[in-house]
């Protein structure tokens, strides 16, 4: 029994190691093709690695660059967006994404956002969910320590310090917890997509015979509100809502 368990664990470890070695080899070859400007070969290898289940912002970023060099803007934007989900703080990813968006046909004015919301979003996007989670845990631990100082210290000055600084760390812990939760939900609940069709008509209902509302073009980002069979109800940045067939978009 124990021997069989050991063999099973050893086999699982071997599979993981060999799988990692395979992925590393493919990534190295893809990087070589990218450096040599052999973008089609690089794309195939990067896609192979990603389809195997391995994810990293660098992979999506390099793949996005390959598609961009090939003039395939929707695919470039899709992969830059996926890279940004994993590394929201990365300025290079954000710059290339904005550059790609500047070249798509549709120029939509987003709904106005209050300054405080923009400020919070800029702070929230300075790092990824795991980092925010660690900051939240560390801050809460410091809050507990300072709480003990407040309850058990006999010196008034230390009690005041423990109380007010403890409240500060509790606030930091709570805020960073919600930052981590937001970033994690974006990763898990992929509710945005990129239009891949050159032109698509947005309709009033999930029916090809329903009223035509407006037209979107390739490369634009849409928010997915709900799904009805093979149709998505989508919202664009200016607040307009409608339905498009799922074949026209790729989920980020």
Question: What is each model feature region?
Answer:
Residues 35, 195-224:
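Beta-loop motif signature
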Residues 158-182:
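Internal/C-terminal transmembrane anchor helices
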Residues 213-246:
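SH3/SH3-like beta-barrel superfamily modules
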